Amino acid sequence: DGKTVLCVYPKGHGRGPIVYKRSNDAGKTWSNRLPTPDNWSSSKEVPTLFQVTDKEGNDRIIMFSGLYPIRMAVSNDEGKNWTGLKPIGEFGGIVAMGTMISVKGKPGHYRALFHDDGRFISNKSKRTSPTRFTLYSSLSVDGGMTWGKPETIYSSTRIHLCEPGSIRSPDGKQIAVLLRENSRRENSYVIFSENEGASWTEPRELSITLTGDRHTAKYLPDGRLFISFRCRTAIGSKLGVSNSPIPYEGDWAAWIGKYQNIVNGDPGQYVIRIADNKKGWDTTYPAVELLEDGTILTTTYGHWQEGEQPYIISVRLKANEIDQLAQKSPKLRINSDTMHLK
């Protein structure tokens, strides 16, 4: 209907009972906490929500909760009623599933990507030394009701790629996945697929302007990309938030540019601080929706007031508003691993 928005989040830092809220006016106001199945209280990681459709045309919403085993809840009535959390297999992962790709030309087929650091992929797995991060893919052929055994996309002890966020190219032929680099040695990374995720390119670094965590993207009506993420860089992690040369280190950030900027490794058009987080990097698992009138609705948590507990805010903005602000905003001087205001 273009107005109803559903939001889930943990009552805690990742682990904790899942809280569920609804907005009936496109994020302007939100309900009180809604009733949830009893075992949603046992969630161990940040929940993720996806809309899916099976090959018969049946719509449903699915919600994942991570660690071992990955569990899933299902709603067949647009979020009014939900099942409890049930395991999807004998495998686990951190923040499952990080992103969902609808397989082109195959109704009801979805590819979900997630990561693990060695601790949760099986019931007997353990973290090794040095720590190895692995990016996985799991395929559903029945509209998200069942999920296949995870396949490894990339695994490394040198760079720790995780928290995938997928973007389809404007012509629909290519998929890009932006990745957090959790060893904090390098910029964020990107991988590409031209066969609907059956295989992927080797990872390569993104521009410093897109470096951070939990990238979530939507196309603006004019064809540009809006990508919301947490700004965290290698140099900032080394020096600390307050000593980082990066203007928006530790803040809720966004990037506007073209898909081809990502392909070319270019910096894009704008880097935006959506909100100033007051405590380290403790912020931002950003959801992003494009409303019917072209408004971006993006929602996440952070420490928005000094000395206060974190809370969740929704921000609404339009591309023309950002363009107007940019005319009177300072420019960035960009190097490969740092940037600062001119």
For each predicted feature, which ranges?
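Asp-box/BNR beta-propeller blade signature and adjacent active/binding-site loops
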Residues: 1-342
